[in-house]
């Protein structure tokens, strides 16, 4: 409890140390975003994942939306770029979970916040596992929006299942 009290007092004190840290983070983020801006604004065809995220961030009513992502690549792609501008507007979570987790998460968010626009990002691999969750959203009258990032790949984490990757191309979703 004492530690929490000290943290609260420090946060409320408008400490110059905290201001310096915030300024330093802002400078680093600005430089980092400069490197990524070409991807977020790219006109390449097909659209890259970062362009989709960049367009959503520019057009979405951030204060009246709740956004999440699915496991794997979509999480890694959106996490650095989505600005959570108000509490509970972005539901981010740990390293990974099962594919298809974003849709039920958004169903719950929509039922709890019916006036909010609820948006889920997921990959094409996860979308293929989510038919019953879409039916649940319809049945429960929980209108959500899902953006499917059609990148034709899954199992994006390097290092796992090397033989299956090399021999069978298990990360490629080609329909073959």
Predicted regions and their residues:
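Terminal amphipathic helices with adjacent charged low-complexity linkers/tails
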Residues: 1-25
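Poly-acidic low-complexity segments
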Residues: 1-3, 20, 48, 61, ...
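Thiamine diphosphate
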Residues: 1-8, 66, 76-176
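Alpha-helix C-cap/termination motif
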Residues: 14, 59-62, 112, 140
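Active-site diphosphate/adenylate-binding microenvironment
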Residues: 27-109
């Amino acid at each position: 409890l004492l530690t929490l009290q000290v943290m609260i007092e420090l946060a409320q004190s408008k400490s110059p140390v905290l201001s310096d840290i915030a300024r330093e983070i802002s400078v680093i983020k600005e430089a980092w975003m400069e490197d990524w801006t070409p991807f977020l604004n790219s006109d390449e065809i097909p659209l890259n994942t970062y362009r989709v995220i960049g367009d959503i961030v520019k057009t979405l009513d951030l204060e009246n939306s709740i956004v999440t992502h699915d496991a794997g690549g979509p999480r890694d792609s959106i996490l650095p770029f989505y600005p959570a501008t108000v509490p509970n507007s972005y539901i981010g979570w740990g390293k990974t979970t099962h594919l298809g987790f974003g849709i039920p998460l958004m169903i719950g968010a929509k039922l709890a916040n019916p006036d909010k626009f609820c948006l889920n990002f997921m990959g094409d691999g996860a979308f293929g596992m989510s038919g019953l969750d879409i039916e649940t959203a319809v049945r429960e009258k929980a209108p959500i929006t899902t953006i499917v990032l059609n990148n034709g790949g899954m199992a994006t984490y390097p290092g796992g299942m090397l033989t299956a990757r090399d021999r069978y191309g298990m990360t490629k979703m080609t329909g073959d």
